[in-house]
Amino acid sequence: MHIPDGFLDPLVAGLFWLGSAVTIGLAVRHARSELGDERTPLLGVVAAGIFAAQMLNWPIPGGTSAHFVGGAFAGILLGPSLGVLAMTAVVTIQALVFGDGGIIALGGNLFAIAVVNVLIGYGLFRMFREIHESGAAFIAGWAAVTLSALIVALGVGFSSAFAYEIGTTVTIMTGGHAVLGIIEGAITAGVYTYIAAARPDLVFTQFENSNLSPDVKL
């Protein structure tokens, strides 16, 4: 899903950078009240785990690549603000250190993976968790990765610098990730269900509406 440099027109890349900068800035502002000695270790553990999972990539014809994303899981476990920051760290390190995704295109990758994936996943989980928590986690994981792929497909499809037309990018990128999203949804649901049962104090969505503060000890 990472967009290399040369795939986006300057205007499209600039719009992605603007959207990413505004959202990440708001996340930093809100995270100040959440990030402390209890949540900092968890933030690092989640980011490291997702970083490792994202290193597995499968090429997609007519697009970039398909891989596990993990933003929905980060949003559910850490909350939207810390989830955005965790995924921002993952995507930025991948681009700057490992060359996974371009530097100019970093704004697009951040918007798709660190913004859309986290916020859509978190929002859908909140919407459906009263019906069935594990099912809500599955829906969040599947829909978040599919919609993130759609954002990437639209970005490169609207760019004249990219060789394929928007119909091709949307069909192949979104379709490929919709299939992969089934696996991501299942993993998100499975890991969430286990953690929520074993260590509910780790899960942001378990205490966000209560007056209790999380007591996180890793």
Curated annotation (Swiss-Prot):
Subcellular location field: Cell membrane
GO biological process, one term: transition metal ion transport
Membrane topology: Multi-pass membrane protein
Cited Pfam families: CbiM
GO cellular component: plasma membrane
Transmembrane segments: 7-27, 42-62, 73-93, 101-121, 138-158, 178-198
Keywords linked to the UniProt accession: Cell membrane, Membrane, Transmembrane, Transmembrane helix, Transport
Similarity comment text for this entry: Belongs to the CbiM family. NikM subfamily.
Function: May be involved in metal transport.
Name of protein: Putative metal transport protein HQ_3621A
Provenance organism: Haloquadratum walsbyi (strain DSM 16790 / HBSQ001)
Designated gene of the protein: cbiM
